[in-house]
């Protein structure tokens, strides 16, 4: 769909306006493109033989803030946790949301190109989401908590999933000096944009990651446990709690799983003696 000299600064406003007013003649090619992207997302999540895939370094994982976790991804971990059905559904919904939002961007008059374009740096491949109005864009579905980091610009100081390094890879490959996140709040339906104006050096990052992956032993743990004040025990922080390799990674101290308000809390087993009188569940 040909853009009408739109700028990405008005993208969210224009999508909202489209949803308010609708359009009598949606572009049929764009509709088919959205449908094809959704079908591919469903096929990939439901029928791709993930257990048979050989793990490889990609743009989407070299930005992981924990190279130790990535080492286990590449070199194997017999105790690694498989993705739960809920997690797979969450990933699928993220792909479907991406296809829908990019369609809405087109219908709102913005130029959307290079969807799922493959790029490569130093042998590491990746597929970017899109380029909108000439700007590199990565669509993210997020929680209300995560949304705040995009809205107030604090993502650079709190990026547990390596979004900026991933964006930097795409930007470096395309010769861009910035990249824009188009974030969607899964709870409220709100959209916002955040532009990262400083991209990291992907080639340097790739070199360091490749060196780490070739080691016989995994790199040191980059994250320390945090103190749970109410239990007076040490527990895993956010990054480690969500990691599929936490059992192996913390085997030297062991983990003590408890639940608080229905949510798992991973205490260090060796810290149990610090508070023997605490209740086992919260």
Give short role names for the model-derived ranges.
Residues 159, 163:
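Short, conserved glycine- and acidic-residue-centered signature motifs
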Residues 131, 136-139, 178-183:
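A structural signal for short, well-ordered beta-strand segments and their strand-loop junctions
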Residues 136-143, 207-213:
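Short, basic, helix/turn surface patches
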């Amino acid at each position: 769909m040909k853009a009408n000299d739109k700028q990405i600064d008005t993208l969210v406003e224009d999508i909202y306006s489209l949803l308010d007013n609708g359009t009598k003649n949606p572009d049929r090619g764009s509709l088919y493109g959205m449908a094809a992207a959704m079908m591919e997302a469903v096929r990939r999540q439901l029928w791709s033989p993930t257990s048979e895939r050989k793990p490889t370094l990609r743009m989407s994982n070299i930005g992981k803030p924990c190279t130790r976790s990535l080492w286990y991804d590449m070199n194997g971990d017999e105790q690694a946790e498989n993705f739960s059905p809920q997690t797979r559904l969450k990933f699928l919904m993220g792909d479907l949301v991406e296809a829908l939002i990019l369609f809405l961007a087109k219908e709102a008059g913005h130029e959307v190109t290079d969807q799922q374009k493959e790029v490569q740096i130093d042998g590491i491949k990746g597929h970017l989401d899109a380029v909108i109005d000439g700007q590199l864009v990565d669509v993210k579905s997020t929680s209300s908590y995560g949304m705040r980091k995009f809205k107030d610009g604090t993502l650079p100081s709190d990026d547990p999933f390596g979004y900026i390094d991933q964006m930097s890879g795409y930007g470096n490959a395309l010769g861009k000096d910035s990249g824009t996140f188009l974030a969607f709040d899964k709870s409220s339906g709100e959209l916002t944009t955040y532009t990262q104006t400083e991209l990291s050096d992907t080639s340097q990052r790739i070199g360091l990651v490749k060196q780490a992956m070739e080691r016989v032993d995994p790199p040191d743990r980059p994250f320390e446990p945090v103190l749970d004040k109410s239990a007076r025990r040490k527990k895993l922080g956010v990054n480690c709690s969500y990691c599929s390799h936490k059992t192996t990674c913390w085997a030297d101290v062991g983990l003590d799983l408890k639940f608080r308000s229905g949510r798992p809390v991973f205490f260090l087993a060796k810290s149990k003696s610090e508070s023997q009188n605490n209740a086992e569940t919260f």
